[in-house]
Amino acid sequence: MKAFYRENKGLHRWLFACGAVLVLFSLLRESRAAMNALVYGVTLPLEQLFGRACAALPFSVAELLYVLAAVTAAVLLVLMVRYLVRSRKKGRAAYRCALFVLDVFLTVCATFSLLWGANYYADDFCDKSGLSPAPVAYEDLLHVTRYFANRLSLASGQVARDENGLFAADRQEILAYADSVYDCLYEEFPFLDLPDHAPKGIFCSKIMSAMNFTGFYFPFTGESNVNMDSPAMLLASTCAHELAHQRGIASEQQCNFLAILACTRCDDANYHYAGWLLGYIHLSNALYRADREAWQEVRDSLPAEVLADLRCNSAYWSRYRGLTARFTQSLNDKMIRSYGDPLGTQSYGAVVDLLVGYYA
């Protein structure tokens, strides 16, 4: 047994180290003071440093790392199969390969927990701002949905459109403005005043669409990344959402709220439109569940251009409802729940509670 342990000593030590980090994280995550010290004293400054370094490059380092990881995984799979075939002691060889794979997996889990998972247990936007979601009264929901529909109608006439009346603003211009979108919130929420690094468009955006993702924040590089293939009318609000993650805010509900607030207050027409549109979509979905007649009344008040954009967005995503989307969204849901958010992916839509509480 000792000889067997010594034979795989490095892999076993690697395993124990990762296990120790994960156990320690599980024990300390209930301590708000410990998580605040980790996030605001170590990981957030570190991610901002990563982000500054990667911002100098014209491509997404996160996307490059994903590609390299996929290629490396394929090469390692071939090498391990060859190793197993050639090995005389196939049981020990299989154990060594399995141990190596487990070590790599736990390393990613441990690093991700430290760089990102800790944010779920540290002070968040609601803790710092004093705002908090509360039960929504029907009358307030209807009032705020009508308000957003009215502002959305006004904003729709301020953006570029193509010959079919669809939103047609330049995507690169939207990305270029992103690092200024939060300037309008610093007076009300000074703790949000952190350096911004503009989101980067993903080259393999169709793969993101197949997984039902419009954007993601990558803590290993401090980069915000956005889908450049999905309809452009919500690209600006996606940028703002991912920039909220850059500030160490993990809650999807809070990031959606901040994205809507920043977009609707900034001085860029494309961001105005995207902010009111994103807010309207979530509010109207909630109103539809509460009162379909009222939902129809509000929807009928929208101009034809907005309705065309909504249909375009729905038609695009209806093409990506297959097994890949269900699988990746299920994984995302489980990941969010594993860090203590009982809503999982439903937390994106829970922004309604914050919006109604703020605007009612």
Question: Which residue ranges define each predicted feature?
Answer:
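Post-HExxH zinc-binding segment in Zn-dependent metallohydrolases
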Residues: 139-143, 148, 250-294
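Transmembrane alpha-helices and immediately adjacent membrane-cytoplasm interface residues
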Residues: 73-78, 92-126
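Membrane-embedded alpha-helical segments of integral membrane proteins
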Residues: 19-83
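Auxiliary, metal-adjacent structural segments of Zn-dependent hydrolase domains
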Residues: 160-228, 232
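Membrane-interface segments at or immediately adjacent to transmembrane helices
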Residues: 117-187
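Active-site recognition of the HExxH zinc-binding catalytic motif
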Residues: 58, 235-256, 260-261
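N-terminal membrane topogenic signal
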Residues: 2-15
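Pan-zinc metallopeptidase signature
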Residues: 305-360
